[in-house]
Amino acid sequence: MTDLSKERIKFWRPRQLPQVELLHASYVKQSFSRHFHDGFALGVVEQGALRFSYRGERLTAFPGCVNLVIPGEAHDGEAAGADGWTYRMFYLDNAVMERAVFELSGKEKQLPFIAAGVLEDTALALAIARLHQQLETDELPLLEQQSRLLSLLTMFVACYGEKQSQR
């Protein structure tokens, strides 16, 4: 099997969560040139390792690590080894993160700031992977999807949000 035949990409928007996009991908040769996202990107590496430049650092996310980028922050990405990497990503509209901040603080239209690009938090990584898998199989009713996503994001913001800034 060639390296490229090992690559696979599934990108979708859950029909009941229009402010969320999901990616489940395996890459071997793929590399991403410097770019940014308008919203938050939050994910977990399942296999291999992802290396990326972010906020002036060269970071590596291994299985069990959470990788993330905040809106507007330029980054790149590539395999950290010959076997590539497999990961699950949430791409979140800012309104989704603003809701999580509101649930915690009562403050509207504020986004959390998280400086780290890689978090070594096994419990959070497992929670991200589990919800992502559930959304992929579409096994949860709408209210449960919304509730679990909000719960995950409020936990994330409560643990790692360093400060909140006006949009």
Q: What do these predicted ranges mean?
A:
Residues 105-166:
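Amphipathic alpha-helical segments enriched in hydrophobic/aromatic residues interleaved with Lys/Arg
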Residues 56, 92, 157, 166-167:
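Proteins with a high burden of low-complexity, intrinsically disordered sequence enriched in S/T/G/P/A and R
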Residues 3-110, 137-138:
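N-terminal regulatory/effector-sensing and dimerization cores
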